[in-house]
Amino acid sequence: MNTTETSRAAAPLVLILGLGETGVAAARWCARQGSPLRVADTRAQPGGLAALQAALADATVEYRLGCGEQFPPDLLDGVAQIVLSPGLVPHESPTRELLEQARERNVEVVGEIELFARALAGLAESREYRPRVLAITGTNGKTTVTALTRQLIEAGGMSARAAGNISPAALAALIDALDQDDLPQVWVLELSSFQLETTRTLAPDAAVVLNVTQDHLDWHGDMQAYAQAKARILKPARLAIVNRDDPLTVAMVESLQALNVRSFGRDVPALVGDMGLELGQGVAWLTACESNDFDEPAPAPRRKKDAPPPTRAGGRMSRLMPVDALRIRGVHNALNALAAMQLARSLDLGWGPMLRTLRDYAGEPHRAELVRSIGDVDYINDSKGTNVGATVAALEGLGQQVVLIAGGQGKGQDFSPLVPVVRRHARAVVLIGVDGAAIGKVLEPTGVPCVAAADMREAVRRAAELAQPGDAVLLSPACASFDMFRNYPHRGEVFAAEVQELALDRGEVA
């Protein structure tokens, strides 16, 4: 037996449970550390199988695929650690039974982000590599804030990589950085509630919870568990950033006035370090509350026993940029911009390069994305609006009357929060998918016309008939897409294609 075989035999056996993108990344990382692997999936041909087989020699991996509705009894034999895919629901069969067995056997259960945190700790010891880490979570806006934060940081002169839920997986990005000898100064991590459930040692320099609305209740069980999963990232963070308009995120910090807390919101900021919006002379501005120019830092007084903790002071408001100068549309995206700026500002970067980058940022695909205008009607692709909160934000943020296209797989959500915003902002609603009728039933009290469409082509055509000049036709389904489409990007692509087809039929060429 050679040295490599000896080290693998001595290393603990790791079970990779679920072979999606994060499972492949975790398997590659564990194999890189010399761990023998066992890979299990309920599917016979999981999506990540080809990628893993290409990356690793078969001899290092034992595959247990096609497990179906029950994992085999001997799956945990010899296993020291389970890396759990965020796509597996812990309280549903067959995952629930396997995790119960793992607890009985004292087998550690972690996720890919936890392995990433431990990898950074190891690199700090072996290479003295200590990057800054910024973490972003929330129901809606995570990908936009993550991508924008990375761009703001790079504009400020620091190297950065974005990874996590945004793709690539964090460990895949780390492997690439190591192989390219291109470790960044800053990691910007988009983290889902699923990922946070299995993360324990990640301690970001700054973390933000953007918002919390109903989503993934089929995975977490209830809103309390969902919010608690999101809140996990704030406690270990050196700087906690929350949305002060959202009571659920405010409740995650001890006090909005605390020295290690920052907030953003729709109102004018009052405490140093906070950001917000201000309406002045008919123009909405992105604003920041900053220290008064002549304030000198006072020496920190010795804190008396039982004295209240020190708090942040008020400051002066600085107007940074008109909201209309942003290319990303809607108030919700203005708030996303504020969150990204606060994260970048936590690295002591200046406003100038940030604002120039922010002005040019066009947003991410399928997120309040303008497809085109036809006959003075804007057609907007917000296919990523897979939950009620996202659709509420899109309707409130656009600032124009809307014909809404909504529906799909509702995931057990309560659709009633749509009622007041549809009443205020929607001229009509076109319903699609298996839960379209359920949404229509909930919206009956609004008095807003609701019509059904069999497919996206009919939905776009019906919406075009209902829209008036100056309106927007908004695809923001408030639902998952899998009843009619491969995924939400496919849904958005079909919508965009139908909009372009409509333009051709009307003789309008882009």
Swiss-Prot record:
- Cite the binding residues for ATP: 138-144
- Indicate where this protein is primarily found: cytoplasm
Task: State its location(s).
Answer: Cytoplasm
What reaction does this catalyse? UDP-N-acetyl-alpha-D-muramoyl-L-alanine + D-glutamate + ATP = UDP-N-acetyl-alpha-D-muramoyl-L-alanyl-D-glutamate + ADP + phosphate + H(+)
Q: What is its EC number?
A: 6.3.2.9
Q: Which residue windows are transmembrane per the record?
A: none
Annotated GO biological processes are: cell division; cell wall organization; peptidoglycan biosynthetic process; regulation of cell shape
Q: Where is this region: Disordered?
A: 294-316
Q: In which pathway does it act?
A: Cell wall biogenesis; peptidoglycan biosynthesis
Q: Name one GO cellular component term.
A: cytoplasm
Instruction: Tell me the GO molecular function terms.
Output: ATP binding; tetrahydrofolylpolyglutamate synthase activity; UDP-N-acetylmuramoylalanine-D-glutamate ligase activity
Q: Which UniProt keywords apply?
A: ATP-binding, Cell cycle, Cell division, Cell shape, Cell wall biogenesis/degradation, Cytoplasm, Ligase, Nucleotide-binding, Peptidoglycan synthesis
Similarity-based family: Belongs to the MurCDEF family.
HAMAP family linked: MurD
Which PANTHER family does the record cross-reference, listed alphabetically? UDP-N-ACETYLMURAMOYLALANINE--D-GLUTAMATE LIGASE (PTHR43692:SF1)
What function is annotated for this protein?
Answer: Cell wall formation. Catalyzes the addition of glutamate to the nucleotide precursor UDP-N-acetylmuramoyl-L-alanine (UMA).
What name goes with this protein?
A: UDP-N-acetylmuramoylalanine--D-glutamate ligase
Protein encoded by which gene? murD
